[in-house]
Amino acid sequence: MLEACESKLDIIKNFVPSWFAAVMGTGILAVDSLLYSSYLPILKDVAVGLFYFNVLLFFIFLVPWVLRWIMFKDNALADLKHPVLSAFYPTIAVSCLVLGADFINIGHNMFWGGVFWTLGAIGMFLFSLIVPFYMFKSESIKLDHVNPGWYIPPVGLIVIPIAGSLIMPHLTGVWHELTVLINYFGWGAGFFLYLALLAVVIYRFILHHPLPSAMAPTVWINLGPIGAGIVALINMVNNSPFITIKEPFYIFSFIFWGFGLWWSLMAIIMTLYYVKKLKLPYAMSWWAFIFPLGAYVASSHLVYKIFKFSIIDYIGFGLYWLLFFFWAITLIKTTNKVYTGEVFKGH
């Protein structure tokens, strides 16, 4: 056990920011299991089990994450300034937002849902400024560094209204107004930052060599802002009494969903290409398969509920099983690498 580690302290020293992507992925799988339990009732029990497991995961990961900033501050700070790894720092804040949604939808606990949402929203606000700031002032970023992982800060902002919109109706006065402001700020800032970065990432895809094998799963992150954006927008519209005409927002969600379907197919094709031509060795980036696809699965169900096109829900349910497969195989691989200590080697 942990034979690949020179010291047990390597667990803390090399605890990369992307670990919380596992919490994001498990949390969205729990929500999707609940959404599709109408097809298979046992999925409701699966959702509850995943929810409790995810809460445990969060606090397990939180310990080395905090200790790293205390014991190996230089390493933690170096990752925050790294042109690739820095984009994964917001995963801890997004994890809080996802857990907030889990507590509200699965745990039926508005208090803890609100606590995690508040922590996540504050964290995302800070990371949405810190991460781009270091990128903007850096003089060493190259085209090699561009990858869909850069979407994570915008995705985190877009995720804010998913649970935040469910909290809005329970507040009054200035707290209600502040929550509305935070939700619309999150979606607006995140969506337009995503559009800007989309152009940069597509530029890299077309005019540069393919992503390294270790970063190949990040192709799936393209689904993150689409799926989360649809879910967040629908939740905001449904919980904003001042929006009296909802249909234009619903139609935009449907159109945006179509863009997501294209990206789903492209991500599958690109993954098969890497598996066949370039290999796809395990890396922590495998967790990039999970949350973005899970967000798109959730968006499929919500779009179906509005337009009542059964084929959309069938597509979502089919992708749910792909999501479950990705999650299971990634969890098994990660557990094995944790046991051997390989995942804690220096990067």
Swiss-Prot record:
Pfam family of the protein (one): SLAC1
UniProt keyword Transmembrane helix, yes or no: yes
Keyword presence, Cell membrane: yes
GO BP term (any one): sulfite transmembrane transport
One annotated GO molecular function: sulfite transmembrane transporter activity
Alphabetical list of CDD domains matching this protein: TDT_like_3
NCBIfam families attached to this UniProt entry: tdt
Protein name: Uncharacterized transporter MJ0576
